Amino acid sequence: TVDMVRSEDDLFRIYPYFPINGNQSFEILYIELDPGASNSSEPHAAGTQEYLIVFGSALELFVGTQKYEILPGNAISFLADQPHMYRNATDKMTTVINVIVYKNE
């Protein structure tokens, strides 16, 4: 069973299928963003890389001062050791597979 994590407004939901633990340096998340939903993340540790695959509708991704629009069926990777935000500016739900790889020290 996967314990869903939801935003206060219930517009953003994360399903941590493979959460981070002491035996692995990655996690795999399934994310649902309702129309208008957004989620900001503080920088992860230096060298952390995120990989996103987008389904449903377009996702706006803000990394530092850069903005990207990822269309359904497309993917992107980025260094997540800076502030970043996901936003669904469409009128349909967006779903994302998110793989976060933490740099081994």
Describe every region a protein language model picked out:
Residues 3-42, 99-103:
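A short glycine-rich, His/Asp/Glu-containing loop-to-beta-strand
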Residues 10-13, 24, 71, 80-105:
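Ligand-binding loop in jelly-roll beta-barrel domains
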Residues 12, 28, 49, 65, ...:
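Short coil/loop residues immediately preceding or within conserved phosphate-binding loops
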Residues 17, 57, 73-75:
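Short hydrophobic/aromatic patches on the structural cores and recognition surfaces of FHA
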Residues 30-34, 44-61:
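Short, conserved beta-strand element in jelly-roll/cupin
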Residues 41, 61-62, 68, 84-90:
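Short beta-strand His + acidic residue motifs that chelate non-heme Fe in jelly-roll/DSBH
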Residues 64-80:
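Short acidic-glycine-tyrosine-enriched beta hairpin
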